[in-house]
């Protein structure tokens, strides 16, 4: 399920490196993390929703690839981001 535009704006303003930043890895990972948490809550209620489970796995893979890219290019930004989002690595 897509995020509401006000939620997207809030995430962008919190994680943007410059104003109107939508493409930086930090913003993308933060948005994916929000979608992943929403889908996880949905799947706790609807255990047999396999279509959404596959979508969740795709989102987790996309987030993992972005985090790997960030770790390779700038380890300090990577560490700060996972600390801020509360992700374990």
UniProtKB/Swiss-Prot annotation:
In terms of PANTHER family, this protein maps to: RIBOSOMAL PROTEIN S15, BACTERIAL AND ORGANELLAR, SMALL RIBOSOMAL SUBUNIT PROTEIN US15M
Provenance organism: Frankia casuarinae (strain DSM 45818 / CECT 9043 / HFP020203 / CcI3)
Please describe what this protein does: One of the primary rRNA binding proteins, it binds directly to 16S rRNA where it helps nucleate assembly of the platform of the 30S subunit by binding and bridging several RNA helices of the 16S rRNA. Forms an intersubunit bridge (bridge B4) with the 23S rRNA of the 50S subunit in the ribosome.
- Does the record's keyword annotation contain RNA-binding? yes
Which family does this protein fall into?
A: Belongs to the universal ribosomal protein uS15 family.
Q: Which SMART domains match?
A: Ribosomal_S15
Q: Name one Pfam family in it.
A: Ribosomal_S15
For this entry, list what GO says about its biological process: translation
| Gene Ontology terms for molecular function | rRNA binding; structural constituent of ribosome
Recall the taxonomic lineage recorded for the source organism. Bacteria, Bacillati, Actinomycetota, Actinomycetes, Frankiales
Which cellular component terms (GO) are annotated to the entry?
cytosolic small ribosomal subunit
For the keyword Ribonucleoprotein, the answer is yes
Spell out the protein name for this chain: Small ribosomal subunit protein uS15
Sorted keywords for this record are: Ribonucleoprotein, Ribosomal protein, RNA-binding, rRNA-binding
Q: Which InterPro entries match?
A: Ribosomal_uS15, Ribosomal_uS15_bac-type, uS15_NS1_RNA-bd_sf
Assembly and oligomerization: Part of the 30S ribosomal subunit. Forms a bridge to the 50S subunit in the 70S ribosome, contacting the 23S rRNA.
